[in-house]
Regions:
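N-terminal extracellular ligand-recognition/capping segment immediately after the signal peptide
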Residues: 90, 94, 98-123, 127-140, ...
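Right-handed parallel beta-helix/beta-solenoid
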Residues: 49-92, 551-557
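Extracellular beta-strand/beta-solenoid scaffold signature
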Residues: 135-145, 164-176, 191-204, 218, ...
Length: 611
């Protein structure tokens, strides 16, 4: 025997010895599955088979216990009796997930009861023909419930081919997350009422929902069948997470045609849900780079979230209420793309009387910064942005762009009594109005450096119901409005450095309660545009209308206002060199800042000293 042949034989013998040691150490004999020493029994001894259907046993499983197993290895499959329909695999499958930490689903599995995953750090993955489906009595239960921390579900397929669902009671669905630090990734969910949920009863922390497909999602609303029904607002979601520290990214959600579903992607905090609130409850949500399409009532939503990012998401059309919505949130940053295409004939959830919009803020919000792009599609009636309900204070900043290809009567912004609303660098095109506003005494609205190209059918910015409040417009551009500004009954109004073109009037004003400033504006029309104040030409408020180009107004002080030391003219905003028109036939110049400083008539040199 040569040296090479001898070395080769030694290597083969060495491998045989190593393999024998591995097999001996892993051998399991008998139904108890206890490990034995290598010389305890002949090598041909076989484990005692378990009785057919015995509880807690896996029929047909060999006697070697490993950390990893597959459903094909355990002979778990629902199509074993093809002629009589699917077999219930619940008992064997539940036992398998309790025994194995690393599990591959590579066969069709059907269950009639929720399977609970109780092993910490368990990993379950799908391959080949692996799929989990519910049997007929699971119209109100989830296929899997994760009850142990750090559970991972990868590459699985879940299907609800019988379209099981319930309008009340328990929810049909794919995965319920009742543990922390869990992940659902690269899975397919078909025809689910509630694909993935982390319920409020637990409040999961550190959840990751990444790169999944939620297809043909179902809803529990009655749609057009019953417009008086309020069903469907507690279920019918692709993903809903009640908890904190959640990341949802890279997912697709498509609603089944004709369904009245609730939400594609939803994150909600837990204020009041826990007796002792943890530091991280209802905080820190990332919702990024997801896509949603179809008749969900809203595609992307956050509720009661303190500290969230919604960015890079695309609402692809079909949302029946709102493309994105922010409800009772705080400290939220938003930058998404919304295509709003719901037909005005689709009235899903009409009993709730939703104000339809591409973007909505609801109830109350603080520190919400929205910088999204919006397209209102052909044939659609909706706002670009709306304060849909107002039960508290809204503190919101809005920017981005909005294009209206829908009804010519559409308005870009519906601002219903926001406490603090800032519009910065917003570009709108094709709308009838830039903004429809209702005010109260606590409202403050500012608009800075915005561009509005309107379609010639409505006012630019219009207060439809006013009772005080403050409106400031600075550096905006308005084109194609019948009247650029119709702003009655506000407390303080300032319009400065603004350009208006292709309009019939610059402004219609009335009922200004405290102060009015219209300065340094420009109208680039063939003829000057009127600024009309319907309460008369001499309002007893602090006002300044000056430095404007292409704007004509009949604002003028009276002799009584000029001579009274207590008039607003003398008490507020008086400065040396200020000139005012008096009775529309004389110009007076202030000779000082004090209320009693005299006024000089430039033509006659007459001096009037207030007293």
């Amino acid at each position: 025997m040569s040296i090479n042949e001898k070395a080769s034989e030694e290597r083969i013998n060495s491998r045989r010895k190593a393999l024998s040691k591995i097999l001996v150490s892993a051998a399991a004999l008998g139904t108890l599955g206890s490990l034995t020493r290598a010389n305890a029994a002949p090598a041909s001894a076989a484990p005692t088979p378990a009785p057919e259907g015995a509880a807690g046993k896996i029929n047909g499983a060999p006697g070697i216990i490993l950390d990893h197993a597959s459903t094909s290895w355990a002979k778990i499959r629902s199509d074993i009796h093809r002629g009589n329909g699917p077999v219930d695999n619940y008992a064997a499958f539940q036992q398998l997930v309790e025994d194995k930490k690393y599990l591959t689903i590579d066969t069709p599995v059907s269950i009639n009861k929720t399977v609970k995953l109780n092993l910490k750090n368990q990993i379950i993955e799908g391959r080949g023909n692996g799929i989990i489906t519910p049997l007929g009595n699971m119209g109100n239960g989830f296929l899997l419930e994760l009850t142990a921390d750090a559970t991972q579900i990868h590459g699985m397929v879940f299907d609800n081919p019988m379209l099981l669902k319930s309008e009340t009671g328990g929810r049909q669905g794919g995965i319920m997350i009742s543990a922390n630090f869990c992940e659902v990734s690269n899975c397919y969910f078909y025809r689910m009422l509630q694909s993935v949920i982390a319920p409020a009863s637990f409040g999961a922390y550190g959840t990751k929902i990444t790169n999944n497909w939620f297809l043909e999602c179902l809803g529990a609303g009655t749609g057009m069948r019953d417009l008086r029904s309020k069903l469907g607002e507690d279920r019918g979601d692709a993903v809903t997470i009640w908890g904190s520290g959640t990341i949802m990214t890279g997912n697709h959600a498509y609603c089944k045609a004709g369904e009245d579903a609730r939400l594609a992607f939803h994150a909600e905090g837990l204020p009041g849900a826990r007796k002792h609130v943890r530091d991280f409850d209802h905080k820190d949500i990332i919702m990024a780079n997801n896509m949603a399409k179809g008749s969900f009532r809203r595609h992307f939503a956050m509720e009661n979230i303190n500290g969230g990012i919604s960015i890079g998401n695309i609402s692809m059309g079909g949302a029946t209420w709102w493309g994105e919505a922010y409800i009772q949130c705080k400290n939220i940053n938003v930058k998404n793309t919304i295509r709003y295409s719901n037909s005005p004939d689709i009235l899903n959830g009409n009993a709730w009387r939703p104000i339809k919009a591409a973007i909505a803020v609801v109830n109350f919000n603080e520190g919400v910064n929205i910088d999204s792009t919006v397209l209102i599609a052909k044939g659609t009636k909706a706002y670009g942005f709306a304060i849909a309900t107002q039960t508290g204070d809204h503190d919101v900043t809005l920017s981005g762009s909005m294009i209206n290809e829908g009804a010519r009567t559409n308005t870009a912004l519906f601002l219903n009594q926001p406490k603090s609303f800032r519009i910065n660098n917003l570009d709108t095109r094709g709308f009838s109005r830039a903004a429809q506003i209702t005010t109260n005494e606590d409202v403050t609205i500012t608009s800075n450096n915005c561009y509005h190209q309107l379609n010639g059918t409505g006012k630019g910015v219009e207060v439809v119901k006013g009772s005080g409040g403050n409106i400031t417009i600075n550096g905006d551009t308005y084109s194609g409005a019948t009247t650029a500004f119709k702003l009655p009954n506000v407390a303080n109004l300032s319009i400065q450095n603004t350009r208006v073109s292709d309009s019939e009037r610059f402004a219609e004003l009335s009922g200004i309660k405290q102060s009015l400033m219209v300065t340094n504006n420009m109208c680039t029309t063939d003829q000057s545009l009127p600024l009309v104040y319907s309460d008369g030409a001499a309002p007893d408020i602090s006002w300044s209308v000056e430095g404007n180009i292409g704007i004509r107004s009949n604002f003028s002080c009276t002799s009584a206002q000029l001579s009274s030391i207590n008039s607003h003219l003398n008490q507020r905003n008086k400065h040396a060199g200020k000139n005012v028109s008096v009775n529309n036939n004389a110009v007076y110049v202030a000779l000082g800042n004090a209320p009693d400083a005299p006024w000089l008539n430039l033509a006659t040199q007459k001096v009037v000293k207030p007293a």
